[in-house]
Amino acid sequence: MKKSPEKQIGHKTIRRITSIGILTAIALTIFVLESQIPPLVAIPGIKLGLANIVTLFALVFLSPTDAFIILILRVTMGSVFSGQIMMLAYSLTGGLLCLLTEMILLKYLPLKNLWAASIIGAIIHNTAQVAVAALITQTPGIFWYMPYLIIAAIITGAFIGLAVPVSYTHLTLPTNREV
């Protein structure tokens, strides 16, 4: 007798794929909604980055691999949905380096310091995006923009790092870690 598809794939795999799908949908929804909000400051490129809450959530409560998948899907689909394919180079570079930084930091920092890892990740994210912009435009002077981006990264990174444990209490997903 042939096994059902659920038994062939495995219950844990189905739950994992479902969790990744749900979190990707949440991240994309947040991304689209945030793109409709007018800039909070008159400095180009500064935004809240609220969809990063979902990636950091996945990193902490699911796995680095799941966070990576969600990040890739969100950034790729977000650039397609927004019609800004060029955004992919900036967002993917910044997002991947941010995720890698947070993965390393979270191996050594207690979960209560998630906000600190998020701030450092946000600074790395912004630095990577400016580096990509400098390479693409051949304009090294763009690095003079960094002090503003670092201030923004400290504020948004802290908010995102503090929002993840709060969001955990409102989501029911199979996770690998407790708050």
Residue ranges of predicted features:
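Residue-level signature of transmembrane alpha-helical entry/exit and packing/kink sites
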Residues: K12-I20, L48, N52, M87, ...
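Interfacial aromatic-anchored transmembrane helix boundaries in multi-pass membrane proteins
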Residues: F31-L48, L73-E102, I136-G141, Y145-M146
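Individual transmembrane alpha-helices with interfacial aromatic-anchor signatures
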Residues: F143-I160
